[in-house]
Amino acid sequence: VTSTMACTITAKKLCIDVAKDCSYIFHLACLGVRHSIHSPFENHRVNAEGTLNVLEAAKQNNIEHFFYISTSEIYGRTTSFPITEEAATAPLTVYGASKLVGEHYTNAYNECYQLNTTVLRIFNNYGPRAHYEGDAGEIIPRSIVRILNNEKPIIFGDGLITRDFFFVKDTAHALAGLIGNPNINYKTFNIGTGVEYTMKDLLLKVLELMDKQELGLEYLADRPADVPRLWVKADKFYNATNFKANYSFENGLKETIQYYIDLSSKKDLIKDIKINNWEK
């Protein structure tokens, strides 16, 4: 990376200008699932219409390949496990729906304009620099910050919903390795580890790694539209790329914990934590 530029993907002309002289676009920009509960229209505008702007920028600048980063949330309450790319899509939130719209727009630009595209459904990403603050706060960093302040990590519901976690550095390596791969055009891939963890087991492991088991867990009411189970089958991706993850779940958690320990020495993180149900 030789330069960076901040812009909003809702500004079409700016997207087109920023994409000049680029060879590849990895489109990760979006607003998250929690945001979609209280601001559905804005969430749609950024995630769906914004994606259309980035696709148009790719087309007008003759980008070599456009990579659309989707989400496991598009699968909703699927009953087909482990989840393959062929599983039915039935998102529960505007976030999931808007990301699925982005997939369709991406495929349409491949079909109509011969733009080389790939859709990547990445399961739950985690690691250093993940959002811990406000309604964007994710369970792993938010819980680490609470534990650092001797507060119990919070579980919404009974703690039995599951997720398939993928460490951010493995994600970065997986994405970078796609450049120049001849086997991925106009294809959709799941990316994950193929191992599911309950929220309860996840937080007990974080407590153990931080040597704070005595804190225990705090249980709050279920959140609306929480997908109950996400467990991926990503063989299609691994076979097409020969990718191998470098991080075990425990090692990824250790690196993540250390990042927030270091960050907490520079700023008061707990004041930015916001705990509420998605309805509010």
Language model segments and positions:
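N-terminal Rossmann-like NAD(P)+-binding domain of SDR-like oxidoreductases, especially those catalyzing
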Residues: 1-125, 247, 255, 259-263, ...
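Short, conserved catalytic or interaction motifs in soluble domains
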Residues: 33, 128, 193
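Short secondary-structure boundary/capping segments
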Residues: 34-35, 80, 144-145, 180-181
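Short glycine-/acidic-enriched loop or helix-start segments at secondary-structure transitions
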Residues: 36-37, 77-79, 129, 165, ...
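Hydrophobic alpha-helix immediately C-terminal to the catalytic Tyr-X-X-X-Lys motif of short-chain
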Residues: 101, 105, 109, 139, ...
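Conserved catalytic loops of nucleotide-sugar-dependent glycosyltransferases that act on lipid-linked
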Residues: 132-139
